[in-house]
C-alpha cells in the first residue's frame, strides 16, 4: 500500500514538473508545437564537418543553462541533468541528445526530455516527459543555428 501511495505522489510531482516544462517550452518555441519527426521526438538536422563540432555546441548550450553533463549510455549520446530545486534535490530534469550521422556533413540531433526520481542515487528512475518536447525542440533549433553560424 505504501508503494502505491509513493507512486501516486511521484506522479503528481512529475505532473507539476511537466506542466512547468510545458509553460516554459511554449514561451521558448515559436508556435508551441513539435513537428512530426522520424523518431517521434524533437529533432533537427545540423550541417557540420564533425560530430565533435556538434558535441561542443551542445555541451556549451546546456552547461550555460545550469545543466550538468552526466555519463551517457552510448558514444552517440549526451545527457544533461538539472536539479528540480537548488540544493540537494532528489529529482532532476534530464535531456538526452542523440547524435546520428546523416549524409553530406550533416547530423540528426534527437532530444528526449526526461524526469529523474532518486537523482544521483543507485535507485534512480527515468520517466519521459513529453510535455517538455516543445522546449527541447526550441533548444535544438538554437543549437543548430549556432553550429551553422560558426561555419
Describe the residue ranges of each PLM region.
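Bacterial N-terminal signal peptides that target proteins for export
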Residues: 2-15
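Classic N-terminal secretory signal peptides
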Residues: 17-19
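C-terminal motif of bacterial Sec signal peptides marking the signal peptidase cleavage site
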Residues: 22-25
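Ser/Thr-rich, low-complexity intrinsically disordered terminal regions
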Residues: 27-151
Amino acid at each position: 500500500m505504501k508503494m502505491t501511495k509513493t507512486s501516486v505522489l511521484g506522479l503528481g510531482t512529475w505532473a507539476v514538473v511537466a506542466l512547468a516544462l510545458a509553460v516554459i517550452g511554449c514561451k521558448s518555441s515559436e508556435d508551441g508545437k513539435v513537428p512530426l519527426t522520424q523518431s517521434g521526438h524533437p529533432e533537427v538536422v545540423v550541417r557540420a564537418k564533425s560530430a565533435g563540432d556538434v558535441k561542443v555546441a551542445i555541451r556549451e548550450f546546456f552547461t550555460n543553462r545550469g545543466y550538468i553533463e552526466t555519463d551517457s549510455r552510448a558514444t552517440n549520446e549526451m545527457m544533461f541533468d538539472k536539479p528540480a530545486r537548488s540544493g540537494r534535490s532528489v529529482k532532476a530534469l534530464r535531456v538526452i541528445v542523440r547524435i546520428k550521422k546523416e549524409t553530406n556533413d550533416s547530423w540528426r540531433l534527437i532530444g528526449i526530455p526526461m524526469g529523474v526520481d532518486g537523482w544521483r542515487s543507485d535507485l534512480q528512475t527515468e520517466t519521459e516527459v513529453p510535455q517538455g518536447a516543445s522546449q527541447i525542440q526550441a533548444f535544438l533549433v538554437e543549437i543548430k543555428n549556432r553550429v551553422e553560424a560558426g561555419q
